[in-house]
């Protein structure tokens, strides 16, 4: 099997139920999310800015890399944060010297909060049924 000449970094990010796989390779700045363009999948500017913030921190010119993102599960905001974490981890694989910059901005921190399970005898995870003393 021939070795590929394209050097790429692959990393995974998670948030709640969202899982994102990010492929980072040298290129012209093309971003592909689940077969769609970046602007189509994430229509809000704040979402795109959040995702690309690790890349802006490391490089001045964002057109150095092509991104291929596969994301599934969760809601849009969970997918945004999962993709940001995946991109930060891919940049870290690309160059280990970036660790201090990424860590100081909190891009390498995985948010551990998940949905709390529903308990029996309760309506929801913490909400109880109405209590009647008499």
From Swiss-Prot:
What Pfam families does its record include? Ribosomal_S9
> Would I find rRNA-binding among this entry's keywords?
no
Q: Where is the composition biased (Basic residues)?
A: 115-134
Q: Please give the residue ranges the record annotates as the region Disordered.
A: 97-134
BP GO terms, sorted: translation
The reply to whether Endoplasmic reticulum figures as a keyword in the UniProt entry is no
- What are the entry keywords? Ribonucleoprotein, Ribosomal protein
Identify one Gene Ontology CC term for this UniProt entry: cytosolic small ribosomal subunit
Molecular function via GO: RNA binding; structural constituent of ribosome
Q: Which HAMAP family match?
A: Ribosomal_uS9_B
Q: Which family does it belong to?
A: Belongs to the universal ribosomal protein uS9 family.
List the PANTHER family hit by this protein, alphabetically. Answer: RIBOSOMAL PROTEIN S9, SMALL RIBOSOMAL SUBUNIT PROTEIN US9M
Please identify the protein, giving its name as recorded.
Answer: Small ribosomal subunit protein uS9
**What's the source species for this entry?**
Chlamydia pneumoniae (Chlamydophila pneumoniae)
Taxonomically, what lineage is the organism? Bacteria, Pseudomonadati, Chlamydiota, Chlamydiia, Chlamydiales
């Amino acid at each position: 099997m021939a070795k590929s000449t394209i050097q790429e970094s692959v990393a995974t990010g998670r948030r709640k139920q969202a899982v994102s796989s990010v492929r980072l390779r040298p290129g012209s700045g093309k971003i592909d999310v689940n077969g769609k363009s970046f602007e189509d999948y994430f229509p809000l500017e704040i979402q795109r800015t959040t995702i690309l913030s690790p890349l802006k921190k490391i490089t001045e010119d964002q057109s150095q890399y092509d991104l291929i993102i596969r994301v599934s599960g969760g809601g849009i905001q969970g997918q945004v944060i999962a993709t940001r974490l995946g991109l930060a981890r891919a940049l870290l694989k690309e160059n280990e010297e970036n660790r201090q910059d990424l860590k100081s901005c909190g891009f390498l921190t995985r948010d551990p909060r998940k949905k709390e399970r529903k308990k029996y005898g309760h309506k929801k995870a913490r909400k109880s049924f109405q209590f009647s003393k008499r």
